[in-house]
Amino acid sequence: MRIEMKNISKAFNGNPVLKNAQFMIETGEVHALMGENGAGKSTLMKILTGVYKKDGGTITIDGQEHTFKNAKEAEEYGIAFIHQELNILSNLTVAENMFLGKELMYGKTGILRTRQMNAIAQQQLAELGLHVKGAMLAGELSVGQQQIIEIAKALMTNASVIIMDEPTAALTDREIETLFTVINKLRKEGVSFVYISHRMEEIFSICDTITILRDGEYVGKRSIPETSFDEVVSMMVGRSIGERYPERNSQVGDVIFEIRNGTKKGKFENVSFQVRKGEILGVAGLMGACRTDIMKAIFGYEPLDSGQIFINGQEVKIDSPIDAIRQRIAFITEDRKSEGLVLDFSIRENLALPNLESLSKGSVLSDELEQQFTADMMKLLNVKASSGEQAVKSLSGGNQQKVVIAKWLGIHPQLLILDEPTRGVDVGAKKEIYSIMNKLTEQGDAVIMVSSELPEVLGMSDRVLVIHEGKVGGILEKDEASQESIMALATGGE
C-alpha cells in the first residue's frame, strides 16, 4: 500500500496545528515521523485514520483519493493505529482482546466459538514469535507482549500499514529486540510501518526513511543511510542545539544524602549509596530491577521497612512524601500523567500544589503570589503555552514534563530525584531538561536520575549506580562507566 498526504492543513479553535504538511510511505517501508512535541505528528496520523477531519489537502492511497470518516473505516481498509497507551483490556483473555468486536459465534445463537478463537489467536501470535495461550488473561502479560498482541490484532484485519506511536517507551531492551524482529519479518511481507518516536538510536536502527515536521509544517524527508543525528535534530528544531549533552561544570562537594541498608520486603534489600552536593548520580538497571521502588521509598511513597536515611549527616525519618518535602527532597515520577500532574487542572493550579504554604499570606492562598510564581516558572523552564490558565492535558509531552519539574523547583530542593525524566520528550526539550539539572548542581544541589536510556546515563552522570534484582550491583565512576560495564552489572556480572 502506497500512501501520499499532500498539503494537509488543520486548525483547532482557529489555532493552526498543521500547515501544508506532507507525508508519503511506500509498501514494505518502515518510515519514521519525527518532530518536537507539538509538531503535529499525531494529528497528521489521526487525519489519515479518520479520527480528525482535515481542513485542506489530499490523501491518496495507491493513486486513488481517499478520506476516512472514522478509525474503524480506516482499519477496514488496512490502516491500523497502535497508540502509546495500548488498547488492551487486562481483564479479558488474549483471544478475547484479539477478537473484540469481531467475535466468532455459532450462527446467530450468540454463543462464542471460544476454543476456535483461542486456537487462532495462539497461532497468530506464534507466527510473530510470541508463544502464549489464547485463554491467558492479557493483564498477566508484559507491556512488550501486549504490544505484539496489538500488532496481531491489526494483522487480523489485514492491515497493510501499521502506525506505532512511541512503541518502545515502556519496553525492556529484550522486548525492543523482539519488536524489531517482528517489524523486520512483516516488512519483508509488504507491511509498512509509520514509526513515531524521539529515540534516535532506534530510528537509525529500524527505519528506512525519516519525515520531519516542525510547527505543523513539512521540513523534509531523508533516507537513513544518507543523513545523520545532527542533521535530523537541526531539521526538527530549526537550529543546531550543539552537543547532545551539555557540559558539566559543577563542583562536587560533601555528602548531601545517604541511604544505609535500605530494605523493602519483596522488592529490594540492603541498598546503600551516597549522593554529594553538585553531583548527578545516574541510576541504571534492567526493567524490574526495582529502581523506581527505591526512589519511592526515599521519597516516602512506600517507606522503608528497615534501613537508615541521612541528610547532611543527620539521620532523618521519611515515612511520607510530606516528610521528604520538609527535607527539601523532590521526586519527579516516571508516570507524569497519572502521578505527576492533575491533567484537568491548569498550569497555575498544578504549580501551586506542592507550594501552597509559600504561596499563601497567612492561611489564604495569594492570587498575586500564585500568578507571579507561575509566570516565573514558565519563563525559567520555557514552558510553551497560551497562558498559565491553559489545562496541562492540552500541552505537549515535553511541556507537561517541564510543568512537573517546575512545581517541584518551588520547594528549592536540595535533592531532586528524576525518574525517566525525558521519556516521550523531544530532543529540544531533553536539552532544556539537562540544562535545568546542570543549573541545580552548579548551585550545590544534588540530582538522582533514573533512566533506561544508557546514552543519557553516560552523558549526564558523574557516577552511575547500577541496580540488579533489588540490590546494588555496583557503583561506577565516570571514567569506568560504559554501556558494557553497566550492562554487566545490571545482569548480575562484575
From Swiss-Prot:
PROSITE patterns named in the record: ABC_TRANSPORTER_1, ABC_TRANSPORTER_2, RBSA
Localisation: Cell membrane
Residues binding ATP: 35-42
Top-level lineage group: Bacteria
InterPro entries per UniProt: AAA+_ATPase, ABC_carbohydrate_import_ATPase, ABC_transporter-like_ATP-bd, ABC_transporter-like_CS, P-loop_NTPase
A single GO cellular-component term on record: plasma membrane
Main location: membrane
Keywords associated with the record: ATP-binding, Cell membrane, Membrane, Nucleotide-binding, Repeat, Sugar transport, Translocase, Transport
GO MF, any single term: ATP hydrolysis activity
Protein name in the entry: Ribose import ATP-binding protein RbsA
Native organism: Bacillus cereus (strain ATCC 10987 / NRS 248)
